[in-house]
Amino acid sequence: MEGFWVSWLGLPGLRSHPRLFLTGMMDGPRSDVGRWGGNPLQPPTTPSPEPEPEPDRRFRRGGGRSFWARCCGCCSCRNVADDDWGPEPSDSRGRGSSSGTRRPGSRGSDSRQPVSRGSGVNAAGDGTIREGMLVVTGVDLLSSRSDQNRQEHHTDEYEYDELIVRRGQPFRMLLLLSRTYESSDRITLELLIGNNPEVGKGTHVIIPVGKGGSGGWKAQVTKASGQTLNLRVHTSPNAIIGKFQFTVRTQSDAGEFQLPFDPRNEIYILFNPWCPEDIVYVDHEDWRQEYVLNESGRIYYGTEAQIGERTWNYGQFDHGVLDACLYILDRRGMPYGGRGDPVSVSRVISAMVNSLDDNGVLIGNWSGDYSRGTNPSAWVGSVEILLSYLRTGYSVPYGQCWVFAGVTTTVLRCLGLATRTVTNFNSAHDTDTSLTMDIYFDENMKPLEHLNHDSVWNFHVWNDCWMKRPDLPSGFDGWQVVDATPQETSSGIFCCGPCSVESIKNGLVYMKYDTPFIFAEVNSDKVYWQRQDDGSFKIVYVEEKAIGTLIVTKAIGSNMREDITYLYKHPEGSDAERKAVETAAAHGSKPNVYANRGSAEDVAMQVEAQDAVMGQDLMVSVMLTNHSSSRRTVKLHLYLSVTFYTGVTGTIFKETKKEVELAPGASDRVTMPVAYKEYRPHLVDQGAMLLNVSGHVKESGQVLAKQHTFRLRTPDLSLTLLGAAVVGQECEVQIVFKNPLPVTLTNVVFRLEGSGLQRPKILNVGDIGGNETVTLRQTFVPVRPGPRQLIASLDSPQLSQVHGVIQVDVAPAPGDRGFFSDAGDDSHLGETIPMASRGGA
């Protein structure tokens, strides 16, 4: 039956995705709200062969909508796209005008584009130019980064020659005419996007000069001087974003003329956080500078007690990145009519940054085996990833949460959405929609791993983007969570958000999109269940402050860390916070979980781990305090295992048991030393370990349970700039690294990247001996002036998560030429560094 529908609807490629098709056709409103039972994480997939591009149909005008388009309301929607995009579309590379490829040699230089000239066509279509006809002999879109357009629209940093503007804001252009402009002449500007532009969908925009257009579009003559016409063009604050074809029509007594399409006259239109009429408007200039224009940022990882930070090169203005971002929308087959809606666009991006369902940008891999790609810890920015996807059409291996989030920040900032990268420490992954983290133990309080499907990630990274939510009741505008890491499905697709942070804070899990899942990540409780003699399970302990313990992002205007936990949840333990948790849990799969709470506690337990560098011995300890007026006997059991940052644990490699006698009001500490040789064979990514502590108080029957995650720190790379940095002039940087391990690091790879400084560069340095120090020197040529950041990383099978950064203040070139012409040089990708040039010490 499924095959019949596929054939009848004429949907190529749908046969291989019957589940997605049936989900889109049959899922009810419940699936629109959140992730009510999805697929588990899938293993890394092999990229599919690059599909052959279809013939270019961008100039097609006529024709009706297809049967599928007539059935699907989202294909003609102007402002709000459907949240279910149905089956995976066929590849649309090379078909539309929203992404496309750039002409050879276009590297974002600051030279002004020559005006376009063409014979044009008259009304008869025979190319004859009659005497007296008003012919457009050239167009100057004033697209140079030094021109007023790019400066006023805050797009002067994009390494592109074409005009890039933000919607809802006027721009200027010049028309060169064959004769003097007369009041009886009529001039019409036209913008077209997509394969089948239609006025009703907003994909064919007609702007009569001197008259008001529809939806906020208009054009005015500001100056007429001889055969030159100065125009001021106003775009709609609700305009579709993308790359538009541009043409001009004229009409006079002598006939009509149309300027031919010219790739040099294509216009990019983006969202506009500076425009009050745009629903992405941000009313703080310092926010816009940070969340739209900043090309680098900090991403936080590790554990709450041992926070690590790394600098990430977003590179949203680098040559080719804007085309890659628009290609992502094309590849998903997103209807052009929905591309003016940031809710729909951000939801598509959350689906397309991961490769599941739709062969998106990044392949997720949490296995620890990255031999067929790049270790997620080795990436230093988004540029290399996005350009690879644009160039090949293949999903890029591999990513984990911070990589997905870093790429998402790049894409959304590039398209004009104020976006930041957010880290949640002790982030829950609720698999059964109970909105609680359920941990099961046997009669002796040993974890039952086969039942523990819920997990708590040491940290999880996602994105906040700023927009109004006209699809929700009032009060839910502002920051919206978008999460591109594929964890659970939403409406049958691996995507998440946008979800109002305000709805998360108050436990309003019925608000779309995906609020139940995100609420559980930040504000669920840990519920400990113990197996009884009859095989049933009983709640023995509820840990209320274990999830979402710290939520942070980079501070505005500095590299400091900003605590934004208060935006996501009320103060822990407050009446408002408890009400939010219980409201959310009432909508989950275990609504009565709080009906039977445990007895009072009089013995407190605190778990600690020594802050150690990888390669050192360490110590873990448990502090017990008796708050009662009677003696207490505590039987304690400690289990130590390694853990992935996702909460997936390895086998227990060390444990100890202890019985402690506590006098009234007394405290005692239980310690367990751990040697490097004990944990070395078991280490996995991030160097994290999980200490499970369980026990009970003999006299009162109180159950003690605690899970404590900690990590081993890795060293940083030391970067030093050798000399001044000037646009267009070679500069040198020194990188120093000391191996902290007593073992040899093999197949060591360095990565170097920085927007405006260095295109992504890979350096293969071979082996580094145990405790050896190496020094590398690398040259680069800055291409843009101003404060920049050069970022480096090191990766090897024995050690990862090693990185460093240096601030580089680049002076303008003599004569202030702006962009240097070699902005897109990729010639150093994959360089092998000879041993003699490493400067080993």
Language model regions located:
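Contiguous beta-strand segments within globular domains
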Residues: 145-191, 228, 612-624, 633, ...
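Short glycine/proline/serine/threonine-rich loop/turn segments at secondary-structure transition edges
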Residues: 237-245, 678-690, 784-791
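Hydrophobic/aromatic-rich core segments of domains that either
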Residues: 28-29, 381-518
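Short beta-strand elements
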Residues: 253-299, 699-729, 801-826, 830-831
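Short acidic/proline- and small/hydrophobic-mixed sequence motifs that coincide with surface turns
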Residues: 184, 630-634, 742-747
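Intrinsically disordered, low-complexity Pro/Gly/Ser/Thr-rich segments with frequent PxxP/GP/PP motifs
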Residues: 652-681, 759-783
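Extended acidic/polar, glycine-enriched regions
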Residues: 179, 183-186, 190-295
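Secondary-structure boundary elements
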Residues: 276-422, 426, 430
